[in-house]
Amino acid sequence: MVVDTDVIVAAMRSPSGASAAILRTARQGRITLLVSVPLAMEYEATCSEAEHQLAAGLTEREVQIFLDAVMAMAEPVKIHFLWRPQLRDPGDEMVLETAVNGRADALVTFNVRDFGTVPARFGIEVMIPREAIGRMRR
């Protein structure tokens, strides 16, 4: 499973929400999070923004600890193939490329519409965090 940056930020900002539940499920080993270097860098850059730190009530050090924990439970994905351009938002391309190269079966994002039908061509289902948690519970 690949989680978009918006899901990582939501997990950091709201530890009781569906996004954080996805990370807890990964920590329990029930799902595998896939992450590439470009996606990890985006996680770090976005989570480190003052706006998100303040909303989460975390210090810079605590944000780094959170990100280290996410990376520790993720499986690294090497990007062998670039599939650009595929999506409306060029910023989403690295998320799709991580999912395709990592052979993910799911991509979790709050921006489902931005990915359109492209991930389905690669056998990847796109869903919001709440939907992902619902499927994991089945």
Residue locations for each model-derived region?
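PIN-domain endoribonuclease scaffold, especially VapC-family toxins
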Residues: 25-82
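Short, flexible helix/strand-to-coil boundary loops that buttress conserved ligand/catalytic motifs
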Residues: 12-13, 47, 119, 137
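Acidic, PIN/NYN-like endoribonuclease modules and their adjacent C-terminal/linker elements
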Residues: 86, 93, 100-106, 112-138
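Alpha-helix/helix-capping structural signal
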Residues: 6-7, 38, 113, 131
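Short, flexible loop segments at the rims of nucleotide/cofactor-binding pockets, characterized by
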Residues: 10-11, 82-88
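Amphipathic coiled-coil/heptad-repeat helices and related helical stalk/stem segments
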Residues: 18-19, 91-92, 111
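Short, well-structured N-terminal submotif of metal-dependent ribonuclease cores
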Residues: 1-35
